[in-house]
Amino acid sequence: HEPDISFVEAATEEIIPFLKKGNLYIIESTSPIGTTEKMQKLIYASRPELEGHIHIAYCPERVLPGNIMLELVENDRVIGGVDEAATQKAISFYSKYVKGEVHGTNARTAEMCKLVENSSRDVQIAFANELSLICDKADINVWELINLANKHPRVNILQPGCGVGGHCIAVDPYFIVSDYPMESKIIGTAREVNNYKSFWCAEKIQNEKLKFELAHGRKPSIALMGLAFKPNIDDLRESPAKYIVNRVLQNDSNSEYFIVEPNIDSHNVFKLTNYNVAIVDADIVVYLVAHEEFKNHKIINDKVILDFCGINK
């Protein structure tokens, strides 16, 4: 989980020969604190004549997969230069097309801002996921509990799931934990909770499978609903659902599994099944991702349902 800025370094080295006085150099990639300053040193080491004559800044992207082009224009942006002149130069550039508000700061604060945004989400999701673990032991419906708790005007608990995925929220907290391990206890623990939730879901599926075998004298057929890292997208990066499916299928070639992901046509590892086939033929139906396609189908009553994402809440 150590940060790797080699791609930022490689990209910077590629453009160094082409930089000219007056140019504006901007990093948008999520990066550890101090990366912009490191790239400044890298540039000046190769091109000392540019020192004080180019503008270097950091402006993290804030976009939602599936809605990128709109959010590039509409969302507020945080922009931090290595000095005030660089900040103002970058603000002038982004103001040409960004309709959201543009907020100026310094490079280190802008870098940390991006990490904090995603780490904050991770911590909040970890609280919801931890509640789901507690409620499972306490025989409480976690979805009802959260709905009732959120009736309080100053409470806003997020929804639990089968973990946290994607190439942002599941990754960015490590940039803070790696550099400040003693000071980031909550952030680090949140990562552990969210990773554990995926393992816990896989164990719940295995336990339900064994219960079915004991009750019926045969192995169940199991539908695993969803592979994407969040609802209604086709992105599988760092997906907890994909981890769970891999773990459940591991060393179990005798059982019949129906893997459903409506947002992709095929997968290089998993054989995909149509939802309508899976929901009819499976004995156990496991909801891993809250895709709209799953919400729009009626649940068949004679199935064993494991709902980790609130499809039936």
Where are these regions (language model features)?
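Structural/interface elements that position substrates and couple domains in central-metabolism enzymes
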Residues: 1-313
